[in-house]
Design a protein with these regions (language model features):
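Cytoplasmic-entry segments and transmembrane alpha-helices of multi-pass inner-membrane transporters
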Residues: 17-27, 139-176, 341-347, 404, ...
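Transmembrane alpha-helices
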Residues: 28-40, 240-269, 407-420, 501-533, ...
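Hydrophobic alpha-helical transmembrane segments of membrane transport/permease proteins
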Residues: 35-83, 185-199, 362-390, 542
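Non-cytoplasmic
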Residues: 38-55, 257-286, 295, 301, ...
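An internal, D/E-rich "acidic patch" concept
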Residues: 80-137, 389-390, 394
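Generic hydrophobic transmembrane alpha-helix motif, especially the helices
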Residues: 127, 156-209, 385, 434-475, ...
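Membrane-cytosol interface at the C-terminal ends of specific transmembrane alpha-helices
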Residues: 193-233, 238, 456-506, 515-524
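C-terminal transmembrane helix and the adjacent membrane-cytosol boundary/short C-terminal tail
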Residues: 298-340, 468, 514, 522, ...
């Protein structure tokens, strides 16, 4: 008895030491990431190799001549001759005293404006999160209903793919035209009350809700396939208690992703805030990057990271409260994929989407996407199936050539993000800081940071998206690995002589790769959207390249006069999204059956 008590006491002490060590590593990761990011931002004006004084002169007045006297005056007034290190030290020392410095452009204090912008963004985030959770609930209802009635059901993801395939800037522009211009139900621009946030909240919440709904639906299907569901049902436990337990079990898997989605709602609203002229944190940080306003840029990035770290800690704490006992005792139930056969629609849907893209490519690749020989904004006809754009170019040709460009680039970036997320997710405590930082920085801000160093282009857009796109995959990997390693049979493997390498290759990895591959395929249209967003803002391929984002940007001013200039690239993007998600579901089932 005493020996058993001694063993239990030692085990509890080892667990406490592990938790303390893990918490210290996580805290150290966040601190190092925050410090490294601030230092990198402080060095940004000098990393591009251009004179910061010249960039500031051009930002203040494009007509003023860049004389040596004018540049010297700017360097002296802002202390640029001290170098980036001394400027960073001065900014940090002032921040500790409640002073974030003065704007290099306006000369006004930075902190009050950023605090007000953060308040606006948080309000918009809360309303967008409400829209996202409501939409995710609607998407998950069929899976939840069938699971309670004994059928482990995974949807084809058609509706969630449709929602995630809508670019936020395109959806925002559509809602602006319909809700504010045509119907006149909501104000079109500005921020003067909660009714100004309705259209922006819908534009931000609908794509996030489609993404969250698919992830949560997959997690629900996996939970309903666990053996304890059958045990509870046979034991006569009510459906209400089973439903509560299923929700608790599923939340433990997706809680880190919910935290990341909440953070991304704050940072990814740059385009939406720009379209609706909302004075939020994303728009303020975007303006600081464009203007090379270092104090405002540092403060904006700092606020984004603080919000990211707060929601990351909150999500991790809630998840630990849900799974604390199971993680400590290594009693996590094993998850298996639903044994349900592929439905007819799940087999036909990707074939239909692939056929549609193939027809688009066959019909459009032989056409010239650069030649302007048609009337401006010509409507669709037999000669112009998709119509013509504002410059008289064939939209079918431009969308077809843009499909090749965007799809190949998005696939390459998705594979890079999967590899990075899988590798980094295996060490969640060490890389928790970079993960939260990568998710806090929207692709637009990352694109601006990359463009400010290497210039605009497709390669810069791909680097920017890959630099931040791995974060959700890494978080998902960390959550899955934690649960897989807490299963009883995994805990018994070292006792049976199974080494670390074999344990991960033959037991952890097969249980991990299916959900991650589906997650990657679900993010493929999102990455294509991010590429389109950067192209829409002029940070991607240079004109007149037929890139999806640029085609969308060129057609947005004419949305009310000729909707077909936007409908064509948006439809192609929706088809790609639906095909990617439906193929991911089929791939996941085949992998599990082979395993």
């Amino acid at each position: 008895m005493s020996e058993s008590l001694y063993c239990r006491t030692c085990a509890r002490l080892n667990q406490m030491n592990y938790l303390v060590h893990g918490s210290l590593v996580t805290l150290l990761s966040r601190v190092i990431t925050l410090a490294g990011t601030i230092v990198l931002i402080g060095m940004l004006p000098w990393l591009s190799g251009r004179d910061p004084a010249l960039a500031l002169l051009r930002a203040r007045s494009a007509e003023q001549e860049a004389t040596p006297e004018a540049l010297a005056a700017i360097r002296h007034s802002l202390g640029l001759e001290q170098g980036p290190l001394q400027l960073l030290i001065n900014w940090i020392s002032g921040l500790l005293q409640g002073d974030a410095g003065k704007s290099w452009i306006s000369g006004h204090p930075v902190l009050p404006g950023m605090l007000q912008a953060a308040q606006v963004s948080l309000t918009l985030m809360i309303m967008s999160a409400g829209v996202a959770f409501l939409l995710a609930t609607v998407i998950c209802v069929p899976t939840f209903h069938r699971g309670l009635h004994g059928c482990s059901y995974r949807s084809t993801g058609f509706f969630s793919a449709i929602f995630t395939s809508l670019p936020e800037f395109l959806l925002a522009s559509f809602l602006l035209v319909v809700g504010a211009v045509w119907l006149e139900w909501f104000p079109p621009y500005g921020w003067n009350g909660l009714h100004y946030a309705v259209l922006p909240s819908l534009a931000m919440g609908i794509p996030a809700g489609g993404y969250l709904g698919r992830i949560f639906s997959d997690a629900l299907a996996a939970t309903f396939s666990e053996n304890w569901i059958i045990t509870w049902t046979v034991s006569g436990i009510s459906r209400w208690h089973i439903a509560c337990a299923v929700m608790k079990r599923t939340l433990s898997t997706v809680m880190p992703l919910i935290g990341l989605i909440l953070v991304s709602l704050t940072g990814s609203a740059v385009a939406v805030e720009k379209i609706f002229a909302i004075p939020g944190l994303g728009r303020a940080t975007l303006g600081a990057v464009v203007a090379q306003d270092l104090p405002a840029l540092q403060t904006g990035i700092l606020f984004l990271l603080i919000i990211a770290f707060f929601f990351g800690i909150l999500a991790a704490g809630i998840r630990y409260l849900i799974l604390g006992r199971a993680l400590r005792t290594s009693s996590m139930p094993a998850t298996k994929e639903p044994d349900e056969k592929n439905s007819r629609i799940s087999l036909i849907l990707p074939l239909v989407c692939a056929a549609a893209l193939a027809v688009l490519l066959l019909a459009g690749l032989s056409r010239d996407p650069y030649l302007s020989e048609f009337p401006r904004l010509a409507p669709p006809s037999s000669a112009l199936p998709f119509g013509a754009d504002a410059m008289g170019r064939d939209l079918l040709a431009r969308v077809a050539h843009g499909t090749v460009h965007t799809c190949i680039l998005a696939l390459i970036v998705s594979i890079i993000c999967l590899c990075l997320g899988l590798t980094i997710g295996l060490f969640p405590g060490v890389f928790v800081g970079p993960t939260e930082m990568a998710n806090a920085l929207p692709p637009v801000i990352a694109g601006l940071l990359v463009v400010s160093v290497i210039g605009p282009g497709s390669s810069g857009a791909a680097i920017a998206i890959a630099a931040v796109g791995w974060a959700p995959l890494a978080t998902h990997t960390a959550a899955l690995v934690t649960e897989i390693r807490a299963r009883p049979y995994i805990s018994m493997l070292p006792v049976m002589g199974v080494g670390w390498l074999r344990q991960n290759l033959f037991y952890v990895f097969p249980a991990l790769i299916g959900p991650l591959l589906r997650h990657t395929m679900l993010r493929l249209p999102g990455i294509a959207l991010a590429l389109a967003s950067l192209g829409f803002l002029g940070l991607g391929a240079a004109p007149p390249e037929p890139e999806w984002g640029r085609v969308l940007a060129e057609g947005m001013p004419y949305l009310e006069r000729g909707f077909w200039v936007v409908l064509a690239p948006a439809s192609a993007l929706a088809i790609l999204s639906v095909m990617g998600v439906s193929l991911a579901g089929l791939t996941g089932r085949k992998i599990k059956q082979r395993a």
